[in-house]
């Protein structure tokens, strides 16, 4: 098992790749909320924990939180982010 951190910025359509978006625009969503991402991860059956009082490193003034997800070693970060995004549309 490996752990992965998911920030809402990773799937935010308003962000550019340089601003932290990790998925292609066709998978990105508008205004992703931590709770919505956590709900999708839960529906996917993945073990996770939520850290609410954390700031995204590129925007230390904004507290948005992140989710720590446990994944199989064969699962890629991009694969999981795309799956989460698809489930949010």
UniProtKB/Swiss-Prot annotation:
It is found in: Cytoplasm. Signal peptide: none annotated. It comes from the Archaea. GO terms for molecular function: 7S RNA binding. InterPro entries: Signal_recog_particle_SRP19, SRP19-like_sf, SRP19_arc-type. Gene3D superfamilies: Signal recognition particle, SRP19-like subunit (3.30.56.30). Coiled coil: none annotated. The keyword Cytoplasm applies. GO terms for cellular component: signal recognition particle. Belongs to the SRP19 family. Involved in targeting and insertion of nascent membrane proteins into the cytoplasmic membrane. Binds directly to 7S RNA and mediates binding of the 54 kDa subunit of the SRP. This is Signal recognition particle 19 kDa protein. It comes from Methanococcus maripaludis (strain C7 / ATCC BAA-1331). The lineage of its organism: Archaea, Methanobacteriati, Methanobacteriota, Methanomada group, Methanococci.
């Amino acid at each position: 098992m490996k752990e992965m951190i998911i920030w809402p910025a990773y799937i935010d359509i308003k962000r550019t790749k340089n601003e932290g978006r990790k998925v292609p625009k066709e998978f990105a969503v508008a205004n992703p909320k931590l709770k919505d991402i956590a709900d999708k991860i839960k529906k996917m059956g993945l073990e996770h924990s939520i850290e609410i009082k954390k700031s995204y490193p590129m925007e230390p003034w904004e507290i948005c939180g992140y989710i720590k997800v446990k994944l199989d070693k064969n699962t890629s970060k991009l694969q999981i982010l795309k799956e989460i995004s698809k489930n949010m549309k």
